């Protein structure tokens, strides 16, 4: 039995969101990211996110300028300009809190990925709360805020350590032309290259 069998409106909304993002081959959107570690001040960053199926994404940060997060479908690269350091990790091994967004790069299926799905109206928008189906992920809960046009406007991820990472999206473009080179990490001159965990 479906986790929301009694809520046809929520089920219809989820199917609409799935259809919107599953049809897209590429996506471009502006993001604002708030990260709040436990017991510490919130950190706000922003920039442009581009996605290409399967498994490729690029986060170009305007704030802090020069920060870069790239997935070529196999590896994730995180470049921090303050340290002039590039860290590489395997996509499946990443416990980065951006990873929950990776499902947008594949076949979005709320029922497959999440459990305890619930919806709550907030004006013209709906807040969907869910938990990951597997305990092997570094987060315990995910919230999506979805508009009447089935666009995901907000994704909030809560980690097991009670940290929160919230993304707000605007200016979404579905299926823009994207240069394949966007998803190939090019290390800036003199950057220190390290493997994750070293």
Language-model segments: residues:
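Boundary at the C-terminal end of the N-terminal hydrophobic targeting segment
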Residues: 3-7
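N-terminal mature ectodomain segment of secretory-pathway/periplasmic proteins
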Residues: 16, 21-73
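Anionic-ligand binding region
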Residues: 101-117
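Solvent-exposed strand-loop boundary residues in beta-sheet-rich modules
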Residues: 39, 82-84, 161
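An acidic-aromatic
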Residues: 48-99, 165-166
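Gly/Pro-enriched, hydrophobic low-complexity segments
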Residues: 12, 87, 112-198
């Amino acid at each position: 039995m479906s986790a929301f069998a009694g809520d046809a409106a929520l089920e219809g909304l989820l199917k609409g969101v799935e259809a919107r993002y599953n049809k897209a081959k590429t996506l471009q959107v502006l993001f604002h990211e708030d990260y709040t570690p436990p017991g510490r001040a919130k950190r706000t960053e922003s920039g442009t996110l581009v996605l290409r199926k399967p498994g490729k994404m690029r986060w170009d940060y305007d704030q802090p300028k020069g920060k870069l997060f790239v997935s070529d479908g196999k590896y994730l690269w995180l470049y921090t300009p303050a340290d002039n350091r590039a860290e590489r990790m395997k996509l499946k091994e990443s416990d980065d809190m951006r990873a929950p967004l990776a499902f947008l790069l594949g076949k979005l299926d709320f029922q497959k990925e999440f459990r305890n799905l619930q919806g709550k109206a907030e004006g013209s928008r709906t807040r969907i709360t869910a938990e990951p189906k597997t305990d092997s992920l570094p987060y315990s809960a995910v919230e999506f805020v979805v508009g009447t046009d089935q666009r995901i406007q907000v994704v909030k991820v809560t980690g097991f350590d009670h940290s929160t990472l919230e993304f707000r999206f605007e200016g979404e473009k579905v299926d823009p032309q994207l240069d394949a080179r966007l998803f190939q990490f090019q290390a800036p001159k003199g950057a220190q290259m390290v493997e994750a965990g070293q």
